[in-house]
Amino acid sequence: MVVVKEGEYAIRDPSLAPKGRDMIEWARDHMPVLGAIRERFEEERPLEGITVGMTLHLEAKTAVLVETLMAGGAEVAITGCNPLSTKDEVAAALVEEGVHVYAWRGETEEEYYQNIDRVLSHEPDIIVDDGADCIARVHTEFPDLAERVIGATEETTTGVNRLHAMHREGVLKFPVIAVNDAKTKYLMDNRYGTGQSALDGLMRATNILLAGKTVVVVGYGWCGRGIARRARGLGANVIVVEVDPIKAMEAIFDGFRVMPMDRAAEEGDIFITATGNRDVIRGEHIEKMKDGVILANAGHFDVEIDKEYLEEHCEEKIDRRGGLVTEYRMPDGKRVYLIAEGRLVNLAAGEGHPIEIMDISFALQALSVEVLAKEGKEMEPGVYKVPKDVDKRVAELKLESMGIELEELTPEQREYMKSWEEGT
């Protein structure tokens, strides 16, 4: 059952709010960077009169970002960016704080897009997106609103790729800041965050030991790098599957084996996809896999593993581990285990990235929203990098919160770095 008050909220259970408040408080206590930004926002109110529409994984860390934007004067409407990642307790708690929340765990595809439409019905000035579903939706279903949107931010690699495609085709109608492409995002969130949280979700769902297992990581971008290194740290034998020769060479130099999926399919005990592309594990690969193989996806959308093949070719389908694992029994007796329906494993089966990592990423989001509020009307449609001063400021705030001081260049060193006369 879902409790709906149109124009205000649509959530699973308002009585879950006390637990949600506790979850948010714990996250808030471990997010000092956003805390520092929130204090400034409370004083300066840079978002006064701005409505922010958000499509993010709706959980405790996201709630702290919502609070930060509201402290700056924004009105917020939010929904989830994945049908299985919403924490119903947090949704209930945010409603009590006056947030327009339209999300619950286990949405159908129709409900998922209906909730995005509900957010867009608030006519947001700025959109904060994860995966670009909301940005794409406002262009296709709300074209008049798209003309009035000041700008947007995008959290993920997958979303940024979609936005570049929109811009190439000439359909993107407002500026979007690619938060994903900031150094403090991809070096920390994509690598350390995904590396830890993807394996955490896998282990929560299965309770298996990784030591001694052969783990195949599909994709060696920043997310794949993090997963591969954390899996090795837990004692796994790691194989990397890549299409990019430079990334493949890096994986080799990092000490991993590299091979095509056809060969890796025969060796792997566990497969984790992290490509942002579709059909990277297909039926012909599944046919070669071992009995008891485990498949998990760390990419944004559930298109990396061929679920249709499993559904169409299995003789029996069984829910395991409280629904976190689906067992497919194939005609030859082989068992294939799919984690969280092939959706984002770290959030569908776990609690997402560590709090301290999202403190950094959401600080980038908050400051990027501020940039759009101040400068967005003068920016042309397109995909923009996070301003360097914002990227640097987030790193400075994080280091300050950790009590870390940096060395400083002397005047002579600064002058030397600008000169060309001195040589050997």
UniProtKB/Swiss-Prot annotation:
Keywords: Cytoplasm, Hydrolase, NAD, One-carbon metabolism. Its main location: cytoplasm. InterPro entries: Adenosylhomocyst_ase-like_sf (IPR042172), Adenosylhomocysteinase-like (IPR000043), Ado_hCys_hydrolase_NAD-bd (IPR015878), NAD(P)-bd_dom_sf (IPR036291), S-Ado-L-homoCys_hydrolase_CS (IPR020082). GO terms for cellular component: cytosol. It comes from the Archaea. NAD(+) binds at residues 156-158, 190, 219-224, 242, 277, 298-300, 346. It is found in: Cytoplasm. Its EC number is 3.13.1.9. GO terms for molecular function: adenosylhomocysteinase activity; trialkylsulfonium hydrolase activity. It catalyses: S-inosyl-L-homocysteine + H2O = L-homocysteine + inosine. GO terms for biological process: one-carbon metabolic process; S-adenosylmethionine biosynthetic process; S-adenosylmethionine cycle. Pathway: Amino-acid biosynthesis; S-adenosyl-L-methionine biosynthesis. SUPFAM superfamilies: Formate/glycerate dehydrogenase catalytic domain-like, NAD(P)-binding Rossmann-fold domains. Signal peptide: none annotated. Substrate binds at residues 130, 155, 185, 189. Its cofactor is NAD(+). Binds 1 NAD(+) per subunit. The keyword NAD applies. PANTHER family: ADENOSYLHOMOCYSTEINASE. HAMAP family: AdoHcyase. Belongs to the adenosylhomocysteinase family. NCBIfam families: ahcY (TIGR00936), PRK05476.2-3 (NF004005). SAH is a product of SAM methyltransferases and is known to be a feedback inhibitor of these enzymes. As a result of this inhibition, organisms have evolved efficient enzymes to metabolize SAH via different pathways. The pathway found in methanogens differs from the canonical pathway, it uses the deamination of S-adenosyl-L-homocysteine to form S-inosyl-L-homocysteine for the regeneration of SAM from S-adenosyl-L-homocysteine. Catalyzes the hydrolysis of S-inosyl-L-homocysteine (SIH) to L-homocysteine (Hcy) and inosine. Likely functions in a S-adenosyl-L-methionine (SAM) recycling pathway from S-adenosyl-L-homocysteine (SAH) produced from SAM-dependent methylation reactions. Can also catalyze the reverse reaction in vitro, i.e. the synthesis of SIH from Hcy and inosine. This is S-inosyl-L-homocysteine hydrolase. It comes from Methanopyrus kandleri (strain AV19 / DSM 6324 / JCM 9639 / NBRC 100938).
